[in-house]
Amino acid sequence: MAESPIVNHPEQGLCRDCLSLQKTQTSRRCHACGSPRLIRHKELYRLSLAHVDCDAFYASVEKRDNPDLRDKPLIVGGGKRGVVSTACYLARIHGVRSAMPMFKALEACPDAVVIKPNMEKYARVGREVRQMMRDLTPLVEPISIDEAFLDLSGTERLHKAPPAVVLARFSKRVENEIGITASIGLSYCKYLAKVASDLEKPRGFSVIGEAEALDFLRDKPVGMIWGVGKAFAAKLESDGIRTIGQLQTMEEGALMKAYGTMGQRLYRLLRGQDSRKVEPDHDMKSVSAETTFNTDLSAAGDLVPVLRALSEKVSRRLKAGEIAGRTIVLKLKTQDFKLRTRNRQLGDPTQLADRIFRTGLQLLEKEMDGTRFRLLGIGVSDLSPSDRADPPDLVDIQATKRAVAESAIDRLRNKFGLNAVETGYTFSKGNLARTQTPTDRDNEP
């Protein structure tokens, strides 16, 4: 739990527009500027752990750069055979969602403007937001290109204001200087800070205090628990469990008996207990992506295309972050929830999808013994700057050719979208990898 050693303030409220502290608890508008955008909470001035998430990030950047799009439904994604990367909130009103097939999105919102993703531009804007976060605290843990956890413990003397005020200033600065909006969740732990940031999008600022955690979670769906994806939520539902409150009545031993080690984790989280610390990005240990399948899989023809798609996802993140990794890590979870991890160290760091995939495939082939898997993941660790990555292979000429081809594919995808070019591994299986249920968050809300 991250708390700031703050002396209790008599005020229990804050205006998000003029940043004045509110002395009355009943007024619906700011006593200084008249704004209705007030934050009130009993623990507002003692909480210091935040989750910051930019709103519909890709679409917001495109609307910023083209004011003519401001009042139009906008979809960022591939062609008719592609998927939605993100949609603005006007498009979401019509039912458009991230990862939706493009033809379905256009059926739902035929008047939508479609723009190909420009990952280079989004990465640049993401770095600007990240720098503003670092101006607040050195304890910034990036989660994706547009979101991060921040720990502002002990920063009140530096900023001459409690974390809630500092975060409200940050939100205004992002909006005024970068031209996009962000939603903020403030709490005492990472899990509930993340939950809070999703409560009032866009331009939200929500607070979940420690005293209210149990009651707040009680009537929420089990899918709100960190790490519970659609597949596990379906398992819980098959057991008659739909709300967190139902799980809160179970003893830790009963949860572990029913769900193994995941049961122990559930017991803590559904009580709002999360001891994870904010880890600054210079201490980032790995970059990974994983997928939980709708149905358990065992055949190579099903698993290999997924591995390829995930390898490309990890590669994109490494390239966007200008980092590389030397150790390839394969993660598998069997149908009975047993976890298998395998790793192999390379001779030099890589950020190439081809090298990640081929090394991961070698590890995967040793595990394909008929076992059915519910989850597959691939990642890299032992990270370093990308300037040391992937030197020319003087022995394997084909590897060098594949690296050149991958660079060309990257340029095409940056220009025309992620689905402009597909490899034989993913294309031949009818894009199986994209039909699975992702447990990582590659498409931002």
Swiss-Prot record:
Gene3D superfamilies: 3.30.70.270, 3.40.1170.60, 5' to 3' exonuclease, C-terminal subdomain, DNA polymerase, Y-family, little finger domain. CDD domains: PolY_Pol_IV_kappa. GO terms for molecular function: damaged DNA binding; DNA-directed DNA polymerase activity; magnesium ion binding. Mg(2+) binds at D53, D146. It is found in: Cytoplasm. Its cofactor is Mg(2+). The record marks Y58 as: Substrate discrimination. Its EC number is 2.7.7.7. Keywords: Cytoplasm, DNA damage, DNA repair, DNA replication, DNA-binding, DNA-directed DNA polymerase, Magnesium, Metal-binding, Mutator protein, Nucleotidyltransferase, Transferase. Residues 49-229 form the UmuC domain. It catalyses: DNA(n) + a 2'-deoxyribonucleoside 5'-triphosphate = DNA(n+1) + diphosphate. The active site is at E147. Binds 2 magnesium ions per subunit. GO terms for biological process: DNA-templated DNA replication; error-prone translesion synthesis; SOS response. Signal peptide: none annotated. It is an enzyme of class 2 (transferase). Monomer. Poorly processive, error-prone DNA polymerase involved in untargeted mutagenesis. Copies undamaged DNA at stalled replication forks, which arise in vivo from mismatched or misaligned primer ends. These misaligned primers can be extended by PolIV. Exhibits no 3'-5' exonuclease (proofreading) activity. May be involved in translesional synthesis, in conjunction with the beta clamp from PolIII. NCBIfam families: PRK02406.1 (NF002677), PRK02794.1 (NF002751). This is DNA polymerase IV. It comes from Brucella suis biovar 1 (strain 1330). The lineage of its organism: Bacteria, Pseudomonadati, Pseudomonadota, Alphaproteobacteria, Hyphomicrobiales.
